Amino acid sequence: MQLQKIIALLLGITMSIVSVSASAAAKKTTQEKQQAVWVKHNYGVKGAKLTPTKVRDKTYSYRLKGKSYTTLNKAASRLYSHSGYASYYGGKFHGRKTASGEIYNKNAFTAAHKTLALGSYALVTNVRNGRKVIVRINDRGPFSKNRIIDLSVASAKAIGMYSLGVAKVKVEAIIVDANGKISGKGAETLQKHMKKAPLAKTKSKII
């Protein structure tokens, strides 16, 4: 009789552990699915769709106009957050090959950066008006003094700087892994932006 009680007790403990583990796993899966949905919708911000892309993790150095630059790997790119001036490029560059090998499209949400990993994303915020855009880094530049990023025409229009030509911005890196999970300084800002979104608008985007 005593043995049966012990067996029953052990079975009860085992079932409780399994139940807790299943609950935790289900919660994690739900959170991952919800995040994947938000990745699809860009957290309510205009720009390049946040999808898993291959990021060039190998660093290299190059020299241009008498100055040397060393690119950032994936881990270092995640920590990138800097303010400075943005410009944009289009016109004669439209249709040309970029540093990543892609053809530059002035109507796509892309950008050139001197060191961020090619294939990574960045959240660019216009400091003057607060407007944001998500861009994918597929080129190198700009190499003009005091410029930290060169936006495509579409990206410049999205943050209201097209007519000005130059604007002060904040650039924060975003990395999207193979499972659709985002990380980096830009990801932190996007999550804060999501929390500030109106409830009705948030629901519509989750659906």
Question: What are the residue ranges of the model-derived segments?
Answer:
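Secreted/periplasmic proteins
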Residues: 22-207
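Bacterial N-terminal signal peptides that target proteins for export
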Residues: 1-9
